[in-house]
């Protein structure tokens, strides 16, 4: 069952401009260490596209959470990570994780699906948050208090 959906488009040139003006301050406030490491392994437009896709993913996730960046949800609470298959997803911490927990129905788990793409000068991301049944071994006194 879908419980949240969000999308965002980001102008890569905007990220370039913000980085020129604010550099490290912007990077440390918006991106996780892992996101920064991934982007810094790339050059030129690929590096900017990597940052812009992750920026768009954070915006899309905030929309899917239904709060935007309010109610204790901050950009630093959202980090793009890759599953072992290479598929991107988001790791939520802090206020974002609390909001995700609050919006997930009892007895269900949350699944965060993410897709990202870029074609200069734009980056795009879409997030779908689904509530999925927990394995029965975790429900009803067989694993959960």
From Swiss-Prot:
Record keywords: Cytoplasm, Fatty acid biosynthesis, Fatty acid metabolism, Lipid biosynthesis, Lipid metabolism, Magnesium, Metal-binding, Transferase
NCBIfam families, sorted: acpS (TIGR00516), pantethn_trn (TIGR00556)
Keyword Endoplasmic reticulum among record annotations: no
Disulfide-bond pairs as recorded: none
Gene3D superfamilies in UniProt: 4'-phosphopantetheinyl transferase domain (3.90.470.20)
Gene Ontology BP term (one): fatty acid biosynthetic process
Gene: acpS
Family: Belongs to the P-Pant transferase superfamily. AcpS family.
UniProt-listed Enzyme Commission number(s): 2.7.8.7
Catalyzed reaction equations: apo-[ACP] + CoA = holo-[ACP] + adenosine 3',5'-bisphosphate + H(+)
Job of this protein: Transfers the 4'-phosphopantetheine moiety from coenzyme A to a Ser of acyl-carrier-protein.
HAMAP family the UniProt entry points to: AcpS (MF_00101)
Pfam families: ACPS
Subcellular location as annotated: Cytoplasm
Protein name in the entry: Holo-[acyl-carrier-protein] synthase
Known cofactor(s): Mg(2+)
GO molecular function: holo-[acyl-carrier-protein] synthase activity; magnesium ion binding
InterPro entries: 4-PPantetheinyl_Trfase_dom, 4-PPantetheinyl_Trfase_dom_sf, ACPS, Ppantetheine-prot_Trfase_dom
Annotated Gene Ontology cellular component terms: cytoplasm
Record: residues binding Mg(2+): 8, 59
């Amino acid at each position: 069952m879908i419980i949240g959906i969000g999308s965002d488009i980001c102008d890569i040139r905007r990220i370039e401009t913000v980085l020129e003006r604010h550099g490290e301050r912007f990077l440390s406030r918006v991106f996780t260490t892992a996101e920064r490491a991934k982007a810094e392994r790339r050059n030129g437009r690929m590096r900017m596209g990597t940052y812009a896709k992750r920026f768009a993913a954070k915006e899309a996730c905030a929309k899917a959470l239904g709060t935007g960046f309010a109610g204790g949800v901050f950009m630093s609470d959202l980090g793009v990570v890759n599953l072992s298959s290479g598929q991107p997803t988001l790791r939520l911490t802090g206020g974002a994780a609390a909001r995700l927990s609050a919006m997930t129905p009892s007895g269900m788990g949350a699944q965060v699906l993410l897709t990202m793409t870029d074609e200069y000068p734009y980056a795009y991301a879409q997030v779908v948050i689904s509530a999925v049944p927990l394995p029965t071994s975790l429900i009803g006194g067989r694993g959960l208090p």
